[in-house]
Design a protein with these regions (language model features):
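Glycan-processing catalytic domains of CAZymes
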Residues: 27-422, 427-457
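Gram-positive cell-envelope targeting signals
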Residues: 1-29
């Protein structure tokens, strides 16, 4: 056989092999969705129900909230029966009602409630041991709320080694202090900047716990002073997420569900959707909703004024439109909690549309890029944030359209990966989609505030 004939045969064989390979690639069956261990988000409302009835607690549960934080101080006359603190009648009644309605519970330390009711009397040095009354409910207690928004010079009060040692003798759940947002004044967060405020709390409090570490913040982005989102929102979350990552802490973010007063005059499902998605772009594990019940200001004549126009409930205690918006959005994100919670947050990267002026909010977190990930490039028709995650299963990304929800603009975000294959896309209503990457690219159509959680298969 001549050399030329051999070369022709080799060419034919190689060509056939290539065609067969290409055909197999075209006909390759899409992979199945991976399976994940069952995990749930924690959803709770701040300002718990006024009425200690099974009907009231069932209404709370039907909203999608699965945990009750025992705190509510809108009372005309303070008593053990209407304030939640260690040893109060209200705490025991709420635990019993939570048991009946399928809710988990976050106890309230409530030292100042106790002093209010007891005429200035102190808990003493070992409050958790002295009021260790809830052993029968330990299976449903997922945390203890210690304080809301401690100032920088109050952190030491909650970081006392003797207090935390007493706590650890009784409880093996998060010791919860909800921190100020970054827009608080220097009298609240100190003069060294917001990240130092968060880091100081982590160094003084969280490091005393080997596990069950939780960082919580309440940043409400839809302020009355603006028709859009507060420009420091992303930077605040980035600071909290970075400290949480370095300390191995879970993260809890409050979702704004109050309208009027210091907040914008209208909120709807689009704003709830966006807040959940943005928090998830930074690795959220827990979500609080402020407010569930309406805070009240009591007047001298015994009447009261509502603090807001409406919350999840109206001033008369009936469900508002936000109740149903929260219900729908909790169902949406809960549908992929197993997948999302299987991954750990690494960083969040901002993306500005080509030729557009950089949004100041995105500029504040502009130090991150996609190095170290499978993403080569992201192009977007709207401001976008991309949370980058990893686990033993691989990489995942939370892609969020950071456009103002009220503008209701839809745009395309194109994510180009360094390889072909498939991706699972979660976050729309309904079942997740398995999408074949076209030339390594994934296109996502999202309205302002919408997000998609993407895992590479």
């Amino acid at each position: 056989m001549t050399k030329k004939r051999v070369q022709q045969l080799v060419a034919i064989v190689c060509s056939g092999a290539m065609m067969l390979s290409a055909a197999c690639a075209l006909n390759r069956k899409a992979p199945a969705l991976p399976t994940y261990d069952k995990q749930d988000f924690v959803f709770f409302g701040f300002w718990s129900p006024y009425d200690f009835t099974e009907e009231s607690y069932a209404l709370y549960r039907q909203s999608g909230l699965n945990t009750m934080l025992f705190t509510n101080h809108s009372v005309q006359t303070a008593s053990s029966d209407n304030l939640h603190y260690l040893g109060s009648g209200a705490t025991m009644r709420s635990l019993e009602l939570c048991r009946k309605t399928g809710l988990n519970a976050i106890l309230n330390y409530g030292w100042w409630y106790y002093e209010w009711v007891e005429g200035g009397k102190s808990y003493g040095d070992t409050p958790f041991s002295d009021y260790n009354l809830y052993e029968d409910y330990k299976d449903m207690i997922v945390g203890v709320h210690i304080a809301d928004e401690p100032k920088y010079n109050q952190i030491d009060d909650y970081a006392k080694e003797s207090l935390i040692a007493d706590y650890k003798r009784v409880y093996d759940v998060p010791y919860m202090l909800n921190l100020y947002p970054s827009y608080a004044g220097q009298d609240a967060i100190g003069y060294e900047g917001y990240k130092q405020y968060v880091q100081t709390y982590a160094d003084k409090v969280l490091t005393q716990f080997d596990d069950n570490r939780l960082l919580s913040v309440d940043f409400y982005p839809f302020r009355a002073s603006s028709s859009s989102m507060h420009s420091a929102w992303l930077a605040c979350y980035n600071n909290v997420a970075s400290v949480a990552k370095s300390t191995g802490s879970k993260q809890s973010y409050y979702i704004q569900t109050a309208v009027g007063n210091e907040f914008q005059g209208e909120l709807g499902q689009d704003e709830i959707c966006m807040q959940l998605n943005v928090a998830m772009a930074f690795g959220a594990d827990w979500f609080g909703f402020y407010c569930y019940e309406m805070p009240r200001t009591y007047l001298e004549d015994g009447t009261y004024e509502p603090m807001y126009s409406y919350c999840m409930l109206n001033p008369d205690g009936t469900p508002s439109p936000l109740y149903y918006a929260v219900q729908s959005e909790i169902a949406r994100v809960s549908a992929f909690s197993d997948a999302y919670l299987a991954y750990d947050w690494v960083k969040t990267v901002p993306v500005t549309p080509a030729g557009a002026k950089e949004n100041y909010a995105l500029k504040l977190i502009s130090g991150s890029d996609f190095s170290g990930t499978s993403i080569e490039q992201v192009t977007a028709g709207s401001d976008t944030v991309v949370g980058c995650f990893t686990s033993e299963k691989g990489e995942a990304f939370m892609v969020v359209n950071y456009g103002t929800p009220s503008e209701k603009k839809t745009s395309t975000t194109t994510v180009r990966f360094g390889r072909d294959g498939y991706a699972a896309v979660y976050g729309k209503s309904g079942a997740p989609e398995i999408v074949k990457l076209k030339k390594g690219e994934l296109q996502l159509e999202m309205a302002s505030g919408e997000g998609r959680f993407v895992t590479l298969l």
